[in-house]
Curated annotation (Swiss-Prot):
Function, in words: Catalyzes the reversible conversion of 2-phosphoglycerate (2-PG) into phosphoenolpyruvate (PEP). It is essential for the degradation of carbohydrates via glycolysis.
Binding site for (2R)-2-phosphoglycerate: 163, 340, 369-370, 391
Pfam families linked to this entry: Enolase_C (PF00113), Enolase_N (PF03952)
Cited HAMAP family: Enolase (MF_00318)
Active site annotation, chain numbering: 205 (proton donor), 340 (proton acceptor)
Signal peptide: none
Name of protein: Enolase
Entry GO terms, CC: cell surface; extracellular region; phosphopyruvate hydratase complex
InterPro entries xrefs: Enolase, Enolase-like_C_sf, Enolase-like_N, Enolase_C, Enolase_CS, Enolase_N
GO MF assignments: magnesium ion binding; phosphopyruvate hydratase activity
UniProt entry keywords in alphabetical sequence: Cytoplasm, Glycolysis, Lyase, Magnesium, Metal-binding, Secreted
Enzyme kind, highest EC tier: lyase
GO BP term (any one): glycolytic process
Organism expressing this protein natively: Onion yellows phytoplasma (strain OY-M)
Length: 430
């Protein structure tokens, strides 16, 4: 039987060169699982706590030796002898062992590493792919990639307020073709930026980070790239934005200050009207974190205005948390949730959040973090849960491409798994 024999942990580096936690679980049967935990740059106030050492002499205070120590000295002795097939029980034990509502005692980075490594050991024991183990007979759909081709905000050093400008290839009939569409647009975008004398350096998530004059200019250049690649905006490819509004919300003014708009301060309603204008001018199908995570009245207004027309994704708003999501569902706020494993800290809680979203007809978007690794868990998770969408960066940087390449492998294995394209947005009425 796959009883846990030992759990190892170590400090490794993520795509930004910052430390993160890697966990390995070994069982008496010989089954083995490994997981590496990602890390975010723009983090929600209510996320589970990522434990950092705070020792300025090591990695500028960002070391994770305490989290590693917690895995080896606290978690391992408690889990020895448990079967890795008992995922729900293991995750409950991890939560109980931590004893805090936000996992601040042991650290969500320690807990998630163990949770995922146990699940991967279970898949290894059963000789299943990870998506097969998590999804059972359910995996039947390949996700639409939400590809972040222009980075701004906290993910880049430029004048663009909004954090991500994405392309969503919905026109193809396979994931393979969708990825090709995205890659071609990305390369055409690079050529256009060069022609305009703009840099083609990339941000944390692999998208270009040009110094543009406005957020709208980013949309215009992306449209130009889509057309240059031979595709039709609003038919073959749609646009999406991660505004990350909490990053430019001024709590004292209670306004949203856009640097690219000459530091103009917008009220919640004014910002919503700004979005309405953009949606009327451009083929935008998704806006993430359009308002601050605590601006629930603003979110309600945003949902009333645009909720039937486009996908309104809550990231910092919901932080992959069933309590937060339930509150949003009850108040009819947003219509989609971003799913980030390390926001909540265990596989079980993540799956519970996805299930809650689907029951309420909210879409679920499986997402990476800006600090990623070669770990491809989220690719499998997107297929396992039939999420229909995955957000894992642009077409550069191996930490991003690793997920796309894993999805190509999965599509080959599933053979007949459909790519639903625009039908993925099943809760939009217009």
């Amino acid at each position: 039987m796959p009883y846990i024999e030992s759990i190892l942990a170590r400090e490794v580096l993520d795509s930004r060169g910052n430390p993160t936690v890697e966990v390995e679980v070994y069982t008496e049967s010989g089954a083995f699982g490994r997981a590496i935990v990602p890390s975010g740059a723009s983090t929600g106030q209510y996320e589970a706590v990522e434990l950092r050492d705070g020792d300025a002499q090591r990695f500028l205070g960002k070391g994770v030796l305490q989290a590693v120590k917690n895995v080896i000295e606290v978690i391992q002795p408690e889990l020895e002898g448990y079967s890795v097939l008992e995922q729900t029980l293991i995750d409950k034990l991890l939560i109980k062992l931590d004893g805090t509502p936000n996992k601040s005692n042991l650290g969500a980075n320690a807990i998630l590493g163990v949770s995922l490594a146990c699940a991967k050991a279970a898949a290894n024991y059963l000789n299943l792919e990870f998506y097969q183990y998590v999804g059972g007979v359910l995996p039947k759909q390949m996700p639409v990639p939400m590809m972040n081709v222009i980075n701004g905000g906290a993910h880049a050093s430029n004048s663009v307020d909004f954090q991500e400008f994405m392309i969503l290839p919905t026109g193809p009939t396979s994931f393979k073709e969708a990825l090709r569409y995205g890659a071609e647009v990305f390369h055409h975008l690079g050529k256009i930026l060069k022609q305009k004398g703009l840099p083609t350096t990339v941000g944390d998530e692999g998208g270009y980070a040009p110094d543009l004059n406005s957020n709208e200019e980013a949309l215009q250049i992306i449209l130009e790239a889509i057309k240059s690649a031979g595709y039709e905006p609003g038919k073959d490819i749609f646009l999406g934005m991660d505004v990350a509004a909490s990053e430019f919300y001024d709590k004292k003014l209670q306004k949203y200050v856009l640097a690219s708009e000459n530091n103009k301060a917008f009220s919640s309603q004014e910002l919503v009207h700004y979005y309405e204008t953009l949606v009327s001018k451009y083929p935008i199908i998704s806006i993430e974190d359009g308002l601050d995570e605590n601006d629930w009245d603003g979110w309600k207004y945003l949902t009333q205005k645009l909720g039937n027309q486009i996908q309104l994704v809550g990231d910092d708003l919901f932080v992959t948390n069933t309590q937060k999501l339930a509150q949003g569902i009850e108040n009819k706020i947003g219509n989609s949730i971003l799913i980030k494993l390390n926001q909540i800290g265990t596989l079980t809680e993540t799956l519970e959040t996805i299930e809650m979203a689907k029951k309420a007809s909210y879409t679920a978007v499986i997402s990476h973090r800006s600090g990623e690794t070669e770990d491809t868990t989220i690719a499998d998770l997107a297929v396992a849960t039939n999420a229909g969408q995955i957000k894992t960066g642009s077409c550069s940087r191996t930490d991003r491409m690793a997920k796309y390449n894993q999805l190509l492998r999965i599509e080959d294995q599933l053979v007949e798994a459909p790519f639903l394209g625009l039908k993925t947005f099943y809760n939009l009425k217009k």
